[in-house]
Design a protein with these regions (language model features):
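Short helix-boundary/capping micro-motifs
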Residues: 10-28
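Alpha-helical linker/hinge and terminal dimerization helices associated
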Residues: 42-43, 64-86, 93
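A short LG(V/I)-centered, amphipathic sequence patch enriched
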Residues: 40-57
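Secondary-structure junction motif
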Residues: 102-108, 147, 151, 183, ...
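Hydrophobic hinge/microswitch elements
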Residues: 135-139, 145, 204-261
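Beta-alpha-beta core module
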Residues: 159-166, 171-172, 232-281
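Flexible hinge/capping segments at coil-to-helix
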Residues: 157-173, 177-199
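Central regulatory/effector-binding core of bacterial HTH transcription factors
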Residues: 89-153
Length: 299
């Protein structure tokens, strides 16, 4: 197995065709096909399913692709270090639920390591996709929460994907509401007081199970429900409709605006917010620095 073969596999997967990949790599189609066949034979797996309609990644191939990306990234780091090219393009990706502290830490990371060239990604996405991203090594770190309700299901899923959960902090439930909301004068809010107001949550796509929800108490029956995909829309609706969402209570006025406040909710439950990593992965210097930045905003 060679780094060149790994580059071939990744390029074919990204382009979706041997023809386009060969053009992009400046190699002949037969040479590219033979190189991939040799790799499949050596690894004793089928990376691509081949049909009359083209090629698609197999399940084994999808897993292999994640490891291949990590190997190439580590090889690039070695080249940067020992070929005297410290200014090479750095790559890093985090997948997270919608937390302002995750964004703030990402900003700090870029300020510290953002050179002339870098390729960083911050994916605010659905819970299942966070798990998939880290499992397939697309992201080095994933940020989500566990509680008594979802822990059994999510812990089983994490284990089956060779992932580990590392707790960052424990939060008591709060509600995000508009500063002009009728309940904004309260020092604490009950679920009963919220019954008449629209409840906003982040949709979870095809995995729209209570267990994958970003919001605690997702299994509660509510009269008015609105699901959204992004933070800006959720906050606009909170303000425009006197809606609310249930959260950790960690708020940043620069990101969330001065019109949104967090008020404690009367409930004894808690949210154990943390990050997930791959058991077989190695935390990079960028990953370690990002986690240090997280602690700054949580401490």
């Amino acid at each position: 197995m060679t780094l060149q073969q790994l580059k071939y596999v990744i390029t074919v997967a990204e382009t979706g065709t041997i023809t386009e990949a060969a053009n992009k790599l400046y190699v002949s189609q037969p040479s590219l096909t033979n190189a991939i066949h040799e790799l499949e034979k050596e690894m004793n797996i089928v990376i691509f399913n081949r049909t009359n309609k083209g090629i698609t990644l197999s399940k084994e191939g999808d897993d292999f692709l994640g490891y291949a990306r990590q190997v190439l990234e580590q090889a690039a780091i070695l080249e940067d270090k020992y070929k005297g090219n410290p200014g090479g393009k750095k790559q890093f990706c985090v997948s997270t639920q919608h937390y302002s502290f995750a964004v703030n830490a990402f900003v700090d990371l870029i300020k510290q390591y953002g050179q002339e060239e870098y390729d960083f990604s911050l994916r605010e996405t659905q819970t299942y996709e966070i798990i998939e991203d880290v499992a397939r090594l697309r992201s080095e770190i994933g940020i989500l929460f566990l509680n008594d309700f979802n822990q059994t299901v999510l812990s089983k899923l994490l284990k089956s994907h060779d992932l580990e959960f590392h707790q960052l902090f424990v939060a008591r439930p709060h509600v995000f509401i508009s500063r002009k909301h009728p309940l904004a004068v309260n020092s604490i809010i009950t679920n009963e007081e919220l019954e008449e107001y629209p409840y906003l949550s982040f949709e979870q796509g095809e995995h729209n199970s209570f267990y994958f929800s970003e919001e605690i108490f997702s299994d509660f029956e509510r009269k008015k429900n609105i699901r959204v995909r992004d933070r800006a829309t959720l906050f606009n609706l909170l303000i425009g409709l006197n809606g609310y969402t249930v959260c950790s209570g960690v708020i940043d006025k620069k990101l969330n605006g001065k019109d949104i406040i967090a008020v404690p909710l009367t409930d004894e439950s808690d949210m154990r917010i943390g990050y997930i990593t791959h058991r077989k992965g190695m935390l990079s210097r960028l990953g370690s620095t990002y986690l240090e930045a997280l602690q700054k905003y949580l401490g």
